[in-house]
Amino acid sequence: MVQTKHFCMLHRTLLCPKRIKFLQSISKLKRHITQIHAFVISTGNLLNGSSISRDLIASCGRIGEISYARKVFDELPQRGVSVYNSMIVVYSRGKNPDEVLRLYDQMIAEKIQPDSSTFTMTIKACLSGLVLEKGEAVWCKAVDFGYKNDVFVCSSVLNLYMKCGKMDEAEVLFGKMAKRDVICWTTMVTGFAQAGKSLKAVEFYREMQNEGFGRDRVVMLGLLQASGDLGDTKMGRSVHGYLYRTGLPMNVVVETSLVDMYAKVGFIEVASRVFSRMMFKTAVSWGSLISGFAQNGLANKAFEAVVEMQSLGFQPDLVTLVGVLVACSQVGSLKTGRLVHCYILKRHVLDRVTATALMDMYSKCGALSSSREIFEHVGRKDLVCWNTMISCYGIHGNGQEVVSLFLKMTESNIEPDHATFASLLSALSHSGLVEQGQHWFSVMINKYKIQPSEKHYVCLIDLLARAGRVEEALDMINSEKLDNALPIWVALLSGCINHRNLSVGDIAANKILQLNPDSIGIQTLVSNFFATANKWKEVAKVRKLMRNGAMEKVPGYSAIEVNGELRTFLMEDLSHHEHYHMLQVLRNLKTEIRDVCSGVE
């Protein structure tokens, strides 16, 4: 009798929906969930209370029982928007975007009106698979149901556009939004930064500040990336100072971004200091430092960092290995480059980015055939892949092969861009193919509607000047109003020196001085021209300018790998312990070359 009374009291207690919800929230085992499920079925609560059904599904999802959650969902005789949303959340947390989209379609088919949460989560599911078309269809439906100005829905659409590379669409939508929160602003800043549109990222950040929104860590990360891409040291250091002053947590992601930013703006020593002070380092952190060394021409340090990284148990990822390949390219370390190639094939799947880095490395190390072999094995070749191979042949001055590759690229329905034509024109310039260079320059403008940049004009002027057609090159400079482009005048002056055209060279040299170059190399070129023309007053003037500017030419150097060790030789460096022996070897080689040449004649 007492037991029956106790059971009845317990039964009445559990009939309260709040009690059931409490039990669901603290249940961490499947058997507890199934017991509650059985109880609510027996009491009819599953039929009468949609909140209980929703919470039961959520409880299943919380403990990872996705299939059981779906079983509960499917057995419900009636399903409202809250129940659908609960099941969608379970699939979202379980990283199953396809099921989210199927549930959304089922919901629409059953004529159940979605709410803000439904649209937001469904668009996020489209983002997971970068299904832009489906995402736009969901967005249209959201507009139809009156969620055009819902900040959560709009924010998810902005994110989808950004991740799918639809920057213009994102900007248009952002401009039409009636209300914007900090998440929307952050999405725009970080989206443009990650897409390499750093100026836009900074522009939106400044607008964000003007609107009175605070700066969080995510925005700061976007700004650090933009600072590095733009080479804006002042902004990068300002962000670093802000992070320090405000006491925002300096976790490994923030510190790695600082290393990356300082390396990109050329402050590699600061990047090294930030890295050395990091409490925790990841493979990504090491990759940023190694890439930084490579970008700043410190190949030896890049190699040393890779060795240290591996000794500490970190395995380099593809980003790190690309940085090592860049270092190999700088010093012509073919042996190390091949080792990296083998490591990639053994540990990673070769993607297009890494393949192009390998092609570039082999080309700069003199193994052009290896570059072509990798190129041929790339499955779906994109524009970057074609441009890289064209550039590889261009470096070696193989103009005819560049033209052949260009034609194959267009036959593959790949549209060339400004970089393609820059490589094409450069190769033709080094090959001395003037008529072909002029032809393809015209094709670029008339057929592909690409407006020539300064780089294209430099290639064409260099092409004409190398061939001795300096008057024609000068006419082009004047007709195209290129008189303020320093690299163009330098290319013209080089041609004048080679072909001893003193009249045009005098014009070019004086124009270069008017543009006030800060490069000691360019000033030396001008001085050498005046010396060739016996204009010693002008020579003295240029040399005085060089002294007054307190400019010091960075000595040229060459590097070669000998028995696995990198040897570097500085110009006019007499400190090497085998200096005199090397000079003797060079003299012997010079004698042998002279003998061979005289024999050929």
UniProtKB/Swiss-Prot annotation:
It comes from the Eukaryota. GO terms for cellular component: mitochondrion. Signal peptide: none annotated. PPR repeats lie at residues 49-79, 80-114, 115-149, 150-180, 181-215, 216-250, 251-281, 282-316, 317-347, 351-381, 382-416, 417-452, 453-487. Residues 564-594 are annotated as: Type E(+) motif. It is found in: Mitochondrion. This is Putative pentatricopeptide repeat-containing protein At3g25060, mitochondrial. It comes from Arabidopsis thaliana (Mouse-ear cress). The gene is PCMP-E96.
